[in-house]
């Protein structure tokens, strides 16, 4: 059952799926080693558990109102093939963000409606933390994150 969540303001989420220009932030991370897809899927799964608001997916009600529902089904992780993905569409399974990878690079693309710049930095930190933890084992988190934001 969908749990409806009304947006705090009338932000027009539909622009993400319509293909028009919108506020999408891109972050690129270059690592020394080849990216392991299953570890990246794990990291995004942990990210969705830790920050459940990332799973908000917009939809239009029968009455024409914009609402959102929380649905963490699937993970928006894709091998980068050069094609364009539209946030909030079937391309991203309805998510307003996605993660792509290619060789030694990870790209995080996130709609500005989900977070401001400070929140996006937290998302970046946690994504990298969970990926590196899955890839290399336990990581000493001292000095990585604010004490109030320690990983699970």
Predicted features by range, described:
Residues 1-152:
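Non-catalytic N-terminal regions of enzymes
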């Amino acid at each position: 059952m969908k749990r409806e969540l009304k947006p705090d303001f009338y932000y027009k989420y539909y622009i993400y799926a319509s293909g028009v220009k919108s506020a999408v932030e891109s972050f690129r991370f270059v690592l020394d080693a080849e990216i392991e897809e299953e570890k990246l899927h794990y990291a995004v799964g942990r990210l969705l558990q830790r920050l459940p608001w990332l799973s908000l997916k917009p939809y239009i009600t029968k009455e024409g109102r914009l609402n959102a529902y929380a649905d963490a089904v699937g993970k928006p992780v894709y091998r980068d093939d050069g094609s364009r993905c539209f946030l909030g569409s079937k391309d991203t399974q309805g998510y307003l963000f996605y993660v792509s990878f290619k060789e030694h690079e990870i790209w995080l693309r996130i709609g500005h409606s989900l977070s401001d710049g400070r929140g996006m930095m937290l998302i970046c930190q946690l994504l990298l933390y969970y990926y590196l933890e899955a890839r290399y084992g336990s990581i000493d988190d001292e000095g990585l994150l604010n004490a109030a934001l320690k990983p699970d």
